[in-house]
């Protein structure tokens, strides 16, 4: 697993001088050991490689060299695939450098019902696994020109949610030239063989990692730390996290603390903030961040106020409940070393590149959602992802990763399980009906008609054991035929019109089946019923429902004005999802009725990030339901769902639909205009002074011009 530490001078690369110049401009004079090894294994000759190495070991530059050398020799296009939108943006900014030598770089994510024909003009495309999967289903011609794929963060194959789509994309991508990049994985030889690639495996890190465990001593407020090399040290403080955080800050380090829930992340951040008076902070830099925070429109007032009080002390929390703009601000403040401590949930470890001198893992247990009162230990991969964030190149000589345990008895076990063990082997996540049926539907959509043998061969190319493929394959074909997603044409299987629409919309076949049954069995219904139906599907958003809240929702069910489109289920799990869907529907109803965002957040106990994600998912599902109802010729439903989709997208009452077509006019500005007598596009054009008065000179002028352009287009 370890490599001889060889550093290759940039000048020794068999690459044109203009390519070498771009790399040099970044201050890189030599390739590090993983990069050197990749070049020695034929990266620049287009050899298929699987590179596994820790976070921060320079994998992106390996991808850049692979793509650029391949395109210079062979022409065509290359696609770089990441599991997260935040990473897509990060990689796009890096790859923009190559426009200096004539390559056109583009980024695409979201909006699954399109073939993105505009990408035919680009050479290097950065996207997500889901987006690429959806593009293949639409069969755009430009995709045939792509002959080099970089599959980033391939260890996401093991992710229960994202794994199936990563595997689906990999099965198709491995039929062409590829470079796969991953965090350290234990069965890398097996995965390399599956990819038809040569493994390049290394544990090299730019900053050495020191791992340890902290536990309480008998003496009050004293904590002992044992490191992997058996050295020890003592720290003092009100609890283990505070003690080690203050110790690291006293050495001018930054600290990333991981907690297992949002509540814990927020309360720990508040606790740490109380001790920051002893830490030297750049108050001017922090007040600059606070000014930027005031300018951010997204986010609830309460979360902004809490963040303000924390950031003023050099601390912040970070989790998916925060809006993207707030998360971005916190990340940038930390990168610039203005914010000293971030307390986050583990999602941060899997996402953007945000190293710190010290990582403190506050919990190795996580609440089990399926069994009340039961806690699971976190996977080893999650521990490695979190600890891998320790040590910032260019700032830190070492990185420290410390796990908090309750007592001395836990120390040995935690060392053996997390510090000294390999991560779990990667296994297929296509082994469920939901994942496997979606996979087959996607293959037929991308490939066109296939014989049973051809379709089966695609399934055999997965990581799933052959016996399991046989079981799922027969079951899937039977179900997809019975539910009219596919049909037999001679000796081949083909998608029905309905099946093709489902594949193009990029929704799960079980979601489509629930929507179809709900619509076909009922006349046009109320908004809440449609929202509830869509939230109840496998693709619907999940939201946390407290016990008291659940009782209130059950009572509310009995008093609804209109009939829901799904019968109450008997099974406990299904019933729980049914209640969850009702909460989502109520949130969306308030959003569409223009209830103030702060009110929604406090009423339903959610974060602004949750609301944004919910709106995005329900926008996609209402759009999909509208198109399915048209396909099924359910015109009454289609009319209702079209309006519902537009209202969900912008969070508006129906009367504002015309105004929000204007770029720069969202729910608040549209309501302001409407309440002041500007109700249609024509009113905007006819009353320019009034519009400028309401929206400000600069924006008002733009809005009037845009309204005039829209009017001309319509007439």
UniProtKB/Swiss-Prot annotation:
Residues 40-203 form the Helicase ATP-binding domain. It holds the Pfam family Helicase_dom4_arc. ATP binds at residues 35, 53-60. Signal peptide: none annotated. GO terms for molecular function: 3'-5' DNA helicase activity; ATP binding; ATP hydrolysis activity; DNA binding. The keyword Hydrolase applies. Keywords: ATP-binding, DNA damage, DNA repair, DNA-binding, Helicase, Hydrolase, Isomerase, Nucleotide-binding. Its EC number is 5.6.2.4. It catalyses: Couples ATP hydrolysis with the unwinding of duplex DNA by translocating in the 3'-5' direction; ATP + H2O = ADP + phosphate + H(+). A motif (DEAH box) lies at residues 152-155. Disulfide bonds: none annotated. Residues 236-442 form the Helicase C-terminal domain. InterPro entries: DEAD/DEAH_box_helicase_dom, Hel308-like_dom4, Hel308_helicase, Hel308_SKI2-like, Helicase_ATP-bd, Helicase_C-like, Helicase_Hel308, P-loop_NTPase. A motif (Q motif) lies at residues 8-36. One of its GO terms (biological process) is DNA repair. Belongs to the helicase family. Hel308 subfamily. Crystallizes with 5 domains; the first 4 form a ring through which ssDNA may pass (seen in A.fulgidus crystals). The C-terminal domain (654-715) lies perpendicular to the ring and is able to bind ssDNA, which may cause it to may act as a molecular brake, inhibiting helicase activity. DNA-dependent ATPase and 3'-5' DNA helicase that may be involved in repair of stalled replication forks. A low processivity 3'-5' helicase. Unwinds short dsDNA substrates with 3'-overhangs (25 bp dsDNA with 25 base overhang), less active on longer dsDNA substrates. Also unwinds the lagging strand of a stalled replication fork (but the leading strand was not tested). Binds ssDNA, but dsDNA about 35-fold less well. Monomer. HAMAP family: Helicase_Hel308 (MF_00442). This is ATP-dependent DNA helicase Hel308. The lineage of its organism: Archaea, Thermoproteota, Thermoprotei, Sulfolobales, Sulfolobaceae.
């Amino acid at each position: 697993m370890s490599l001889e530490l060889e550093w290759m001078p940039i000048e020794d690369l068999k690459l044109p001088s203009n390519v070498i110049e771009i790399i040099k401009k970044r201050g890189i004079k030599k390739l590090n050991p993983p990069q050197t090894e990749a070049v020695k294994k034929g990266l620049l000759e287009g050899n298929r490689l699987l590179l596994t190495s820790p976070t921060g070991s320079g994998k992106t530059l390996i991808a850049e060299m692979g793509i650029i050398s391949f395109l210079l020799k062979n022409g065509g296009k290359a696609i770089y695939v990441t599991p997260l939108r935040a990473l897509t943006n990060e990689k796009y900014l890096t790859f923009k450098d190559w426009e200096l030598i004539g390559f056109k770089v583009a980024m695409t994510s979201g909006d699954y019902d399109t073939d993105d024909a505009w990408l035919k003009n680009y050479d290097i495309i950065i996207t997500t696994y889901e987006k690429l999967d959806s593009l293949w289903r639409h069969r755009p011609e430009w995709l045939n020109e792509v002959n080099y794929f970089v599959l980033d963060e391939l260890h996401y194959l093991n992710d229960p949610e994202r794994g199936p789509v990563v595997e689906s994309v990999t099965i198709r991508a491995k039929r062409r030239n590829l470079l796969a990049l991953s965090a350290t994985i234990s069965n890398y030889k097996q995965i390399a063989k599956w990819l038809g690639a040569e493994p390049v495996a290394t544990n090299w890190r730019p900053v050495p990692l020191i791992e340890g465990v902290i536990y309480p001593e008998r003496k009050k407020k004293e904590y002992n730390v044992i490191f992997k090399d058996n050295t020890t040290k003592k720290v003092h403080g009100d609890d283990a996290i505070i003690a080690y955080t203050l110790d690291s800050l006293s050495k001018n380090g930054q600290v990333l603390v991981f907690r297992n829930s949002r509540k814990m992340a927020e309360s720990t951040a508040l606790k740490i903030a109380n001790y920051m008076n002893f830490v030297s902070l750049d108050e001017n830099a922090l007040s600059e961040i606070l000014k930027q925070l005031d300018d951010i429109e997204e986010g609830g007032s309460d979360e902004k106020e809490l963040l303000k009080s924390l950031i003023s002390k050099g601390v912040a929390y970070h989790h998916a409940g925060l809006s993207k703009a707030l998360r971005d601000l916190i990340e940038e403040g930390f990168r610039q070393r203005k914010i000293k401590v971030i307390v986050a949930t583990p999602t941060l470890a899997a996402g953007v590149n945000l190293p710190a001198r010290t990582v403190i893992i506050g919990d190795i247990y996580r609440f089990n959602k399926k069994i009340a009162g039961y806690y699971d230990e976190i996977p080893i991969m999650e521990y490695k992802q979190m600890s891998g964030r320790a040590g910032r190149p260019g700032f830190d000589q070492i990185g420290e990763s410390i796990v908090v345990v309750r007592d001395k008895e836990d120390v040995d076990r935690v060392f053996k399980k997390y510090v000294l063990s390999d991560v779990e082997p990667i296994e297929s996540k296509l082994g469920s009906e939901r994942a496997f049926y979606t996979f087959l539907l996607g293959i037929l959509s991308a490939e066109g008609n296939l014989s049973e043998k051809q379709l089966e061969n695609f399934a055999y190319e997965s990581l799933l054991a052959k016996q399991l493929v046989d079981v799922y394959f027969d079951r899937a074909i039977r179900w997809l035929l019975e539910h009219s997603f596919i049909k037999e044409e001679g000796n081949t299987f083909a998608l029905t019109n309905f099946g093709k629409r489902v594949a193009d919309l990029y929704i799960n076949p079980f979601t489509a089946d629930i929507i179809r049954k709900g619509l076909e069995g009922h006349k046009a219904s109320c908004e809440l019923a449609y929202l509830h139906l869509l939230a109840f599907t496998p693709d619907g958003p999940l939201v946390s429902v407290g016990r008291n809240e659940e009782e209130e929702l059950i009572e509310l069910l009995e008093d609804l004005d209109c009939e829901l489109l799904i019968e109450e289920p008997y099974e406990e799990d299904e019933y729980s999802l049914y209640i969850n869907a009702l909460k989502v529907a109520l949130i969306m109803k308030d959003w569409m009725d223009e209830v103030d965002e702060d009110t929604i957040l406090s009423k339903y106990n959610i974060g602004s990030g949750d609301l944004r994600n919910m709106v995005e998912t329900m926008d996609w599902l209402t759009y999909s339901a509208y198109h399915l109802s048209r396909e099924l010729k359910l015109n009454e439903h289609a009319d209702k769902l079209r309006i519902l989709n537009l209202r969900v997208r912008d969070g508006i009452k129906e009367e504002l639909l015309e105004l929000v077509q204007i770029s720069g006019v969202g729910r608040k500005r549209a309501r302001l205009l409407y309440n002041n007598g500007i109700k249609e596009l024509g009113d905007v054009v006819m009353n320019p002074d009034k519009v400028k008065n309401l929206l400000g000179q600069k924006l008002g002028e733009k809005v009037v011009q845009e309204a005039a352009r829209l009017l001309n287009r319509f007439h």
